[in-house]
Regions:
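Non-heme Fe(II)/2-oxoglutarate
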Residues: 2-95
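Catalytic core of non-heme Fe(II) oxygenases with the double-stranded beta-helix
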Residues: 71-131
C-alpha cells in the first residue's frame, strides 16, 4: 500500500489551531493548478453519473437543488483527494481524540439557479458526522 502524505503546502499545526480556535480551517492553494485541472477533467468526464443531491430526509428540492457524484476508488484522480482527507483525519484524531474512521466526499454541480440552503443535515440522535 502506498504511503499518502499531506501536501507540503498544508501547515498541519495551523490547520489544527484554526479548527480549535475558530471551528474551521481554510487551506489556501491546497492543491496545485495541475491537480485541480485533473480533478475538473475527471469530474466533467463523469457528468452522466451525477444524481440529485439529498439531505438526511431524502431529496428536498427547497433545501438543495444541486447534483452530486460521490468520490470512489474508480475515480482515480479524486480518490487521491479522499486518501489525503484520511491522512488529515488521522491528524484530527490525534489532536482532538475524535475517532474518525470514515471519510466521504463528493463533487457537486450547480446549474444556473440551483442552490444549497442553510440547514442541519445531522439530526439529533444520528450524529455520525464529526467534522
Amino acid at each position: 500500500m502506498e504511503a499518502v502524505l499531506l501536501p507540503k503546502s498544508w501547515n498541519v499545526d495551523q490547520i489544527l489551531d484554526d479548527l480549535d480556535q475558530h471551528g474551521f480551517a481554510i487551506i489556501d492553494d491546497a492543491y496545485s493548478s495541475e491537480y485541480i485541472h485533473q480533478l475538473v477533467e475527471e469530474c466533467t468526464s463523469h457528468l452522466n453519473q451525477f444524481r440529485d443531491a439529498a439531505i438526511q430526509n431524502g431529496i428536498v428540492s427547497n433545501i438543495r437543488s444541486d447534483h452530486i457524484l460521490w468520490l470512489h476508488e474508480e475515480l482515480k484522480i479524486s480518490h487521491q483527494h479522499t486518501k489525503t482527507l484520511y491522512v488529515l483525519a488521522e491528524q484530527f484524531n490525534r489532536a482532538f481524540y475524535l475517532g474518525i474512521n470514515n471519510v466521504e466526499a463528493h463533487f457537486a454541480c450547480y446549474n444556473s439557479g440551483e442552490f444549497y440552503a442553510l440547514h442541519r443535515d445531522n439530526p439529533q440522535g444520528k450524529n455520525g458526522r464529526i467534522i
